[in-house]
């Protein structure tokens, strides 16, 4: 054999790896080749079609051939990495055939194409010692474009346009610049807290300047306080002149409807009978109804008086409220929203609770439900004596007047109709009997002294000194 023939045969053997078999005509389902070309120009494309999985002609034409201008590497590189390509193609075809029979053919096609494309990318562009193994696989075996776009979109929606590998908090750079990450000593931290109010520690030693009010006039303290008292006195006098129900002198309630700034004026009002109240009560109610603005101011003045009453006076105010409720129940009148008597029922209740709480605690202790629990429920079923009747009805009046909108009637407060048979003065009499019975049975001298001072509000003992360095009394 000549040398030329030997060299020609060796060249043909070395170029077999780059041969490709291109179908000249259409093939059947078994991929049988009907016409093949074995020219040297199409040798590279024949090898690719032979091992590629079944796919459309459009995908085949998109792959660049080694003879094109975009192809990289020479014949030596193709021969060196030819085994890698064949192994990748064989593994892709074997993986596609191992899929389930009912799997989607397009899924098998996509998996095989991704494997072959990744092998081609690794052949043409190989990193040289850059990054770790995870970065190497991410760069050379990327995900599908659809999945990659979804991941970038998800990260962009969460963290903005940051593209670092380790996504940090958006406030990390700001905290790093301000020095929040560094530990400080006590002296340095104290100076830092003074400059940063939102990190300032709580100091129990509050300076007195925080509670001091700036003085408007350079006057002595006693003159300044006298000026304050005189100003309030003039204000009350002006209010008493402006606040007037404007009733005629023939009105039977004209004496008690006037506003007076005199401290010696009577607070209990005239003593009347139930028959007189039943006859003249609707006139007082109509006065409250047609004068809503003055009635609201009268409620404020009345509440200030009721909260400072003694125990006996508080019982009288409770009797006034219950008798007024009985009038509405008997005559079936609608309750006025700005009625001063009903509006101040809560003040009467609070004063009675304050006076009766030590007595009830001494009598019942923890054996019975507390007064707060009973009033929180305010159920008509809990009424069993005059004391519970008075407290529960006052609580229900306050609740209805403040929480119920629209028309209000007496049956909303007293659903059991206890006020129909109620005798005015009954609650006050029975509560005083209740307190006196406890005094005779209780062996605690402190409780007996408290009851005596409550029933007769005369100063006996309790105040030891009056400290005031600003002015003298």
UniProtKB/Swiss-Prot annotation:
GO terms for cellular component: host cell cytoplasm; host cell nucleus. Pfam families: Herpes_UL69. Belongs to the HHV-1 ICP27 protein family. A zinc finger (CHC2-type) spans 362-447. It comes from the Viruses. Keywords: Early protein, Host cytoplasm, Host nucleus, Host-virus interaction, Metal-binding, RNA-binding, Zinc, Zinc-finger. It comes from Gallid herpesvirus 2 (strain Chicken/Md5/ATCC VR-987). This is mRNA export factor ICP27 homolog. It is found in: Host cytoplasm; Host nucleus. Multifunctional regulator of the expression of viral genes that mediates nuclear export of viral intronless mRNAs. This immediate early (EI) protein promotes the nuclear export of viral intronless mRNAs by interacting with mRNAs and host NXF1/TAP. Associates in a complex with RNA, and host export factors NXF1/TAP and ALYREF; these interactions allow nuclear export of viral transcripts. GO terms for biological process: regulation of DNA-templated transcription. One of its GO terms (molecular function) is RNA binding. Zn(2+) binds at residues 362, 438, 442, 447. Residues 57-81, 123-143 are annotated as: Disordered.
